[in-house]
């Protein structure tokens, strides 16, 4: 499936659910794909051009499940075809770098957020890390790099130099690590 890829990334991206919040925390947090699609439609109509997407299992837990992501991407593509979709590879302390990479390969999303330090806890990019970044770049995936401190910026620069990726990168420095 070919997903919408804007020439320029939208200036407003919504992140309606994250990895941890549940209905007890906020009754409107979308946990199912159906709920997430409905929120995405409403946000798009209000002016958001992109969504940062987490999928949940039947227990409402954040999962790196390629099947659920593909289902969500398919639904979002049909319901909000002009919205840029970014999936997360967030480990949440339960997924390994190998599982993060596997999700990215299996889904090949239009956009992905990658916590650089989560993906490369050794702080030394491996051949597998380089292959992943080259693959996603060649596939046209827009990567948002989550960086929490200056060391993470150095790690990303090292990774991109080793991978010989010179294209525009998208960096986010969250105000706090999760």
Set out the residue ranges of the language-model regions.
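Single conserved hydrophobic/aromatic residue that forms the stacking wall/gate
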Residues: 169-178
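Active-site beta-loop-alpha junctions enriched in small/polar residues
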Residues: 15-19, 56-58, 88-92, 115-119, ...
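Active-site mouth loops of central-metabolism enzymes
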Residues: 19-35, 88-96, 121-123
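N-terminal small/glycine-rich loop or linker at the start of catalytic domains
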Residues: 2-28
């Amino acid at each position: 499936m070919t997903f919408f890829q804007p020439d320029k990334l939208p200036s407003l991206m919504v992140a309606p659910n994250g990895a941890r919040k549940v209905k007890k925390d906020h009754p409107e947090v979308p946990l199912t794909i159906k709920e997430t699609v409905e929120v995405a439609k409403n946000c798009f109509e209000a002016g958001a051009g992109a969504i940062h997407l987490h999928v949940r299992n039947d227990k409402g837990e954040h999962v790196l499940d390629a099947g659920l992501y593909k289902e969500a991407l398919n639904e979002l593509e049909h319901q909000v075809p002009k919205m840029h979709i970014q999936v997360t590879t967030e480990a949440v302390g339960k997924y390994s770098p190998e599982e993060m990479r596997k999700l990215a390969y299996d889904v090949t999303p239009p956009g992905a957020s990658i916590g650089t330090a989560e993906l490369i806890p050794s702080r030394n990019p491996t051949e597998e890390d380089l292959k992943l970044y080259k693959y996603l770049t060649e596939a046209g995936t827009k990567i948002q790099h989550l960086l929490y401190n200056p060391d993470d910026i150095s790690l990303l620069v090292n990774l991109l130099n080793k991978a010989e990726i010179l294209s525009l990168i998208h960096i986010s420095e969250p105000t706090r690590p999760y």
